[in-house]
Amino acid sequence: MSRYRADIAILGACALHAELGLSASQEADADVKRAMLAASAEHWLVADHTKVNHCEPWLVAGLSDIHHLFLDRPWPELGDDPALSVHIADA
């Protein structure tokens, strides 16, 4: 994947934790997500409420590495990070 370059990486979350960040349930999935983040300028993450406040065994990235976070509900535990743009989908 190092031969490729992308403007935006849009990732789906396996698990998302306010302190631990993005994690994956499978090592190969975590490796691909890390490579996509390394090869892109913008990092977008999509997650629904079933993924937040969870952690899987394979850490991918901290929330500080994500530029835009798209959720289906507000996430009170997230706190306030001015570098992270949080978008809540309208139902």
Residue positions per predicted region:
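Conserved phosphate- and dinucleotide-binding cores of soluble alpha/beta proteins
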Residues: 1-91
